UniProtKB/Swiss-Prot annotation:
Cofactor remark from the record: Magnesium. Can also use manganese.
Compartments, record wording: Cell inner membrane
Provenance organism: Treponema pallidum (strain Nichols)
Positions that bind FAD: 118-120, 181, 187, 278-280
Gene Ontology MF terms: metal ion binding; transferase activity
Identification of the protein by name: FAD:protein FMN transferase
Record's subunit section: Monomer.
Membrane topology: Lipid-anchor
Gene3D superfamilies membership: ApbE-like domains
């Protein structure tokens, strides 16, 4: 398995010209797609636009430059990241941090409080013992895991914003040996930044996919070969948690919405016939045992969808419903082990079942 610090540029900008130039003076829509391995995962951005190709090229270049820069800030798996430097100062004085890191930590601690710790950005000490998704993943020694959990209290993370313009923001990890790990929220945070960047370039039709964290911006175009291409909602697939992932079990139609799914199938290892997945329960320190196979969150902000997907998977169905009532405009789709599917009111009519083994309850 490869470390998330790998930078491998797998492709240059692919521009699919579906109608060259203009037709009768009308600019036609062009589809642009770019993919790279960065932030430890495959990141894809697809854009539809009538704007000059050079402008779209420039915007996509900015997107992937942003991702490369932010990996140097937010990665828990790079020794040279800003987050690693902060973790190294745990138990000492406050540390001046990058404003993007500070903003992300603010939101992460908000969701930690709201979820009662089911989402916990300070779980790094325990996560490192498991090392799931990397080389040498292993079941930790029980005593070592118990000790690590004593260093996972998110309430020991203290933020202080600069009170004047230009004043530094600081973060203090009050307990020695504690470690932040933002893997359950960072991709959502970066997806939001990408959407802001695309919008600033007057690009209003795009699909951002950061390792399965989706943001569907605006409406897509249908047949881009037509000068009057139809605008359609994006169809986002939800996989069978026990399938190969090659074909979706469900499809949900969305626009201006992030879709993030958490499930036990994403990263795991097996020992002695037992599967250990990567979503750790902060109470037990072990992979979460829950009554759902996967949870998909639909939200206007990908940061929120990312954090809530993890929290809801750990909490299970009933407690998740209680939590989500505090977030108007956020919807959820739950897949249960018996292949029942429950979706909240805001999206249930947008769900199409493609695999007849799954039953959408209404």
């Amino acid at each position: 398995m490869k470390s998330s610090c790998v930078y491998w540029r797998i492709g240059v900008l692919v521009c699919i010209l579906c109608g060259v130039g203009s037709c009768g003076g009308r600019a036609r829509v062009r589809e642009y797609s770019r993919a790279e391995l960065v932030i430890g995962t495959l990141c894809r951005v697809r854009v539809y636009s009538k704007r000059p190709a050079a402008e779209v090229h420039a915007a996509l270049e900015e997107v992937f430059t942003l991702l490369q820069q932010q990996e140097m800030v937010l990665s828990a798996n790079r020794d040279d990241s800003a987050l690693a430097a902060l973790n190294a100062q745990a138990g000492s004085a406050p540390v001046v941090v990058d404003r993007s890191l500070y903003a992300l930590l603010e939101r992460a601690l908000f969701f930690a409080e709201k979820s009662g710790g089911a989402f916990n950005p300070a779980l790094g000490a325990x996560v490192k013992l498991w090392n799931i998704g990397f080389d040498r993943a292993a079941v930790p020694d029980p005593d070592a895991l118990k000790e690590a959990l004593t260093r996972c209290d998110f309430r020991q993370v203290h933020l202080r914003a600069g009170v004047s313009v230009g004043a530094p923001h600081t973060v203090q990890l009050a307990q020695a040996g504690m470690q932040l790990d933002l893997g359950a929220i960072a991709k959502g945070f970066l997806a939001d930044k990408i959407v802001q960047l695309l919008t600033a370039h007057a690009l209003d039709s795009a699909l951002v996919d950061l390792g399965g964290n989706i943001f569907a911006l605006g409406l897509k175009y249908g047949d881009v070969r037509s000068a009057a291409a139809q605008r359609l909602e994006w169809n986002v697939g939800i996989r069978d948690p026990h399938g190969t992932g090659q074909k979706p079990a469900l499809v949900v139609s969305v626009r201006d919405c992030s879709v993030v799914t958490s499930g036990a199938y994403e990263r795991f290892f097996e020992r002695d016939g037992v599967r250990y997945h990567h979503i750790i329960d902060p109470v037990t320190g072990f992979p979460a045992h829950t009554d759902v196979d996967s949870v998909s969150i639909f939200a206007p902000r990908s940061t929120d969808a990312d954090a809530l997907a993890t929290a809801c998977f750990v909490l299970g169905y009933e407690k998740s419903c209680a939590l989500l009532r505090e977030f108007p405009g956020v919807d959820a789709l739950f897949i249960f082990p018996d292949k029942r599917v429950r979706a909240s009111a805001g999206i249930v009519d947008r769900v199409r079942v493609l695999d007849a083994r799954f039953v959408l309850e209404r």
